[in-house]
Amino acid sequence: MANWHEWAELLERVREENPLVHNITNVVVTNWTANGLLALGASPVMAYAKEEVGEMAKLAGALVLNIGTLNDKEVEAMLVAGQAANEAGVPVIFDPVGAGATRYRTETARRIAEQVKLAVIRGNAAEIANMIGEAWTIKGVDAGGGSGDRVALAKRAAEQLGAVVAITGKEDVVADGQTTYLIQNGHPLLTKVTGAGCLLTSVIGAFAAVERDAAAAAVAALVYYGVAAEQAAAKAGERGPGSFQTAFLDALAYTSVDDVKRHGRVEQR
């Protein structure tokens, strides 16, 4: 695909194909993630048992791994599912929630990246930096006050990790090691909704299920998500984060390809 305007049409493909997205995600965001994927037009499944995750991953259009509330049992299930997805050619999307906050969390994120071929890694700057051994402060599972060139960081991480890297924040950055995209859509109220980033990772999974160009899938998903947030804020943002969350779920359903093309703000470098 030639440019992001064409990639925006992936939204229609997601809604037409209704891809199955297998999520091994955290307990905080499971319901929100499932509802968000349904609103988008994808079909979510949450399967965690090591005894079935390999089989389920092979049935899915994409596998999403999220270490937000990790434990040894779940990590082993992620590795089984990830390796099964690799065998079946199913793209694996990874959210290294809180990498850098604790040694266990950081080591787990790196272990998954080493043992599973990842298509896209989506995180904040601190999480991505800590995955490649660079210093960047982190507060709990949120990026701290670290300073640095996020564009350069995304490029380095993509090269070192062998995956498309999406660093999200006030401005989103997507890098595949050769080309970098800056996305300027979104709204500050997303930071007031628990699991907004986790749902975004699963939305990337839905787009990756219908488009094997991982960079295209990531850019299209981020622009769509950001435009939906802007539309939700315009309708309900003044009433606060609760009203925004409801409006955002609606916006995920009604935001169109034309909306994305009209309101998307993407710079290619």
Swiss-Prot record:
Matching CDD domains: THZ_kinase
Protein name: Hydroxyethylthiazole kinase
Pathway: Cofactor biosynthesis; thiamine diphosphate biosynthesis; 4-methyl-5-(2-phosphoethyl)-thiazole from 5-(2-hydroxyethyl)-4-methylthiazole: step 1/1
Cofactor(s) the protein needs: Mg(2+)
SUPFAM superfamilies registered for this protein in UniProt: Ribokinase-like
Binding site for substrate: 46, 195
Stored HAMAP family: Thz_kinase
Keyword rRNA-binding (UniProt): no
Family designation: Belongs to the Thz kinase family.
UniProt keywords, alphabetically: ATP-binding, Kinase, Magnesium, Metal-binding, Nucleotide-binding, Thiamine biosynthesis, Transferase
